[in-house]
Amino acid sequence: MIDTTLPLTDIHRHLDGNIRPQTILELGRQYNISLPAQSLETLIPHVQVIANEPDLVSFLTKLDWGVKVLASLDACRRVAFENIEDAARNGLHYVELRFSPGYMAMAHQLPVAGVVEAVIDGVREGCRTFGVQAKLIGIMSRTFGEAACQQELEAFLAHRDQITALDLAGDELGFPGSLFLSHFNRARDAGWHITVHAGEAAGPESIWQAIRELGAERIGHGVKAIEDRALMDFLAEQQIGIESCLTSNIQTSTVADLAAHPLKTFLEHGIRASINTDDPGVQGVDIIHEYTVAAPAAGLSREQIRQAQINGLEMAFLSAEEKRALREKVAAK
C-alpha cells in the first residue's frame, strides 16, 4: 500500500510519545528511578495502550513513564537520537517531530531551554547518522496553563532557527485556543508555521478557532470537522491540511472504530489529509502499520492511500525546492 516511488513522511509524530519501552527500562535503572515493572514484558502494559482508553486524557497518562525517566539532558538527547533511528527503520524519508520541553523537563526540573537544545542536538546527530530528513515542531502543553506555555515559547524562541512550527496540544476542552492568542502572535512574528491540535476532543468550533484566531495552516487530528460541512468546504478550498492519526483516534476513543473514521470522507471531499502515527511508542504501531493495516480498515482505496502519501509531502513544512529535491532523491533510488 506504500508507493515506494514517493517520499514517505510522518508529519504528526510526538518525539516524547515515542520513547522506546527498552529505553524507559534502561534509563530507569541508570538513574535509579522506580518503575512499575522490572522487565520489558511486564513494563509494556504500563507504557503502551493495550486496550482502547476511555478518552484523550486517559491515553495521555500512558506517556508519563517515558518522561519520568528523563533525569538529565543526556537522556533527552538520547531519546531524540533514537526517534530518528526509529524513523529510519520505518523507511521514512522525512519526519516532523513535535515535542513539549516543559513536559519533558517536569519530572526532574530540567531547564526547559536546555531540553530544547538537547533535542535539537539529538535530532541533528540522528539525521547525520541515519540519513533521514527531519524538522522540529515546538509544542506548548496547554494542560499546564498559559504561564507554562509562555516558558516553553521562550525556550523555542531562544532556538528559533531550529524550530519550524508551533503547536498547541493537551487538554483541548479545558484549555481552549483563545487562552493562547498572544503566544501564537509571537510565533507568527518569528516566521514559524502553525499547526494546532483541534477537533479531537472538542467540536468543529475548535478547528474554526485554530484557523481564524491562531493562524493554523494545518490541523492535528481534526476528526470533528466531519460534523460541519461548511468547515470541510473551507479546509478543501484553502488547502488547510488535516494530520490524520488513524490508530490513535481509536485508542483515545475519539472515533469508535476504523470503519467510522472520517479520513476517507475528507479525501473524497478534496481535503488535503495525510496518514501519520501520533505517539508510536505508546501506541505500539509504526507508519507501515498505519498504511498497510489501519488505512485499508478505514475504507481507503489503494488510490486514496497513495493520495494521502502525496498529501504528506505537500502538507510538510518544507519549501517548494526542498519538496522537489526530496521527490527527485526518492525517485532516483
Curated annotation (Swiss-Prot):
One of its GO terms (biological process) is hypoxanthine salvage. CDD domains: ADA (cd01320). One of its GO terms (cellular component) is cytosol. It comes from the Bacteria. One of its GO terms (molecular function) is 2'-deoxyadenosine deaminase activity. The keyword Zinc applies. The record marks 221 as: Important for catalytic activity. Keywords: Hydrolase, Metal-binding, Nucleotide metabolism, Zinc. It catalyses: adenosine + H2O + H(+) = inosine + NH4(+); 2'-deoxyadenosine + H2O + H(+) = 2'-deoxyinosine + NH4(+). Signal peptide: none annotated. The active site is at residue 200. Zn(2+) binds at residues 12, 14, 197, 278. Substrate binds at residues 14, 16, 170, 279. Its cofactor is Zn(2+). NCBIfam families: aden_deam, PRK09358.1-1. Catalyzes the hydrolytic deamination of adenosine and 2-deoxyadenosine. Belongs to the metallo-dependent hydrolases superfamily. Adenosine and AMP deaminases family. Adenosine deaminase subfamily. This is Adenosine deaminase. It comes from Escherichia coli O1:K1 / APEC.
